[in-house]
């Protein structure tokens, strides 16, 4: 997936902290907590066990916030599918 339409952030820790944000929501790694996004009314889909943005796009969404659910994001879809809904 071409990510030029998104904002990406990578922070090096023992495992990288990764987030890809579109205008409607974000795809994030497991370092981030859905509850925080939920509290703020933000759309997020969480994927786990990823080391780079390509792996994020291919990974299965594990958790979503209610705002992401309203956009049509569902657990089990790929990160790429989730990003298409949050672009």
Give the ranges of each region predicted by the language model.
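Residues that scaffold, gate, or flank divalent-cation-dependent active/transport sites
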Residues: 1-87
């Amino acid at each position: 997936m071409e990510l030029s339409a998104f904002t990406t952030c990578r922070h090096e820790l023992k495992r990288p902290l990764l987030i890809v944000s579109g205008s409607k929501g974000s795809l994030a790694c497991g370092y981030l907590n859905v509850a925080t996004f939920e509290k703020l009314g933000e759309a997020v889909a969480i994927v786990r066990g990823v080391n780079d943005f390509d792996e994020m796009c291919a990974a299965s969404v594990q958790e979503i916030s209610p705002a992401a659910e309203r956009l049509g994001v569902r657990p089990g879809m790929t990160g790429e599918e989730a990003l298409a809904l949050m672009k």
